[in-house]
Amino acid sequence: MTATNHDIPTKAGRREWIGLSVLALGALLYVMDLTVLHLAVPALSADLQPTSAQLLWIIDIYGFFVAGSLVTMGTLGDRIGRRKLLMIGAAAFGVTSLLAAFSTSAEMLIASRALLGLAGATLAPSTLSLIFHMFTDPKERTIAIGVWIGAFSAGSAIGPVLGGVMLEFFWWGSVFLLALPVMALLLVLGPRVLPEYRDPDAGRLDI
């Protein structure tokens, strides 16, 4: 059997490595939002006056919606295209970050965090799948996945630090505005440096 060009690993170029940096930033931000709010709890509690139950939902609902939507978003990306889903998710993440930042009630912040979770669930499966298709050389793919995993680990650690810095100078909602420049960068560079990929054998979409 003769190997096709698609089967032969090729070295990644400048475009792929720039694309990886964009994807890594998105992954870092996705994880950051799990922890960035922790130090803001006293300030937002004083401002929004949430009940104990509402405060738990404000903190936890993002993670719940991310975890509950990952499989669905992965299948959706297979059907409509990974890059397309990533762009939709990045735009939604930016908009819902604004809603969260300027929430005027506990209920509004809970709803915004839930929508952030749905948007965040588009980032993890889309970024990893795109990395697999951008890097076909086994060694380069291993490096790229290592960078992606490192971004996840860094996001968890950096979230409280950046959140604390923002709270030192601004109001509690400013911690959500960290997403805006990253999502803007993803939306500008994504169509230029990221390939599109659809799975012709995508499974049924389960809600």
Predicted features by range, described:
Residues 187-207:
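Helix-loop junctions on the cytosolic side of multi-pass membrane transporters
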